Design a protein with these regions (language model features):
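Gly/Pro/Ser/Thr-rich low-complexity, intrinsically disordered segments predominantly at protein N-termini
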Residues: 1-201
Length: 201
């Protein structure tokens, strides 16, 4: 099924339309959009995170899955995060996560602004989600968004490679050096890292 320009789809129509199609798509307010392909570094990070989360999720009766698992974030919006931990009842035929608790997005310079705004708000609006990790692919930096008991969200930036990021719902943790394993990424430059020349005349 080809997507006509500005053709409005329901969630069910969208999921049926993309079944078996090459490429990645998302549904945003009823409109299907093709997603750009990912660089190798992005894919390595996703694989590293998935490798760390799968055994921890299994111990808690949950499932950590890749970007093929959909999240319905609105009545006519479907997202495909890079990694999702779903703690709902197992359903091998399901196309969407029933009770997502952890959502992971790997961002690049071209996607960071959007991922840090619209998608984040959508993920935080899902009642079962209590942790969102936004991982930079080009520098060593992870933004950790946690839902507190009062319903409010906190944000923490983690940049130290040996720092643990706690995953309370899985009773586990992950370090930056696990996330960026095999990749040559560095922390973001600090002001003192730049040499500032003398002022001009």
């Amino acid at each position: 099924m080809a997507f006509a320009e500005a053709e409005k789809l329901t969630v069910d129509q969208f999921l049926e339309a993309i079944a078996g199609r090459d490429g990645r798509f998302e549904l945003v307010r009823g409109i299907a959009y093709a997603m750009a392909g990912a660089k190798q570094g992005h894919n390595v990070i996703c694989s590293n995170v998935l490798t760390a989360l799968v055994p921890a999720a299994k111990r808690k009766g949950c499932r950590a899955t890749s970007s093929d698992t959909a999240l319905q974030t609105g009545p006519d919006t479907v997202r495909y995060p890079d990694v999702v931990v779903d703690c709902g009842p197992p359903n091998p035929a399901a196309l969407t996560a029933s009770s997502p608790t952890i959502v992971v997005e790997v961002s690049s310079m071209s996607t960071a602004v959007f991922d840090y705004s619209a998608k984040l708000r959508e993920y935080q609006a899902i009642a079962s989600v209590d942790l969102v990790l936004q991982i930079e692919s080009e520098i060593a930096l992870v933004k950790v968004h946690r839902r507190q008991q009062d319903g409010y969200w906190t944000e923490e930036t983690v940049e130290a490679f040996d720092r643990d990021i706690d995953l309370p719902s899985l009773e586990a943790s992950i370090k930056l050096n696990e996330i960026y394993d095999t990749l040559d990424v560095r922390p973001r430059p600090r002001l003192q890292d730049f040499k500032i020349g003398p002022a001009g005349p």
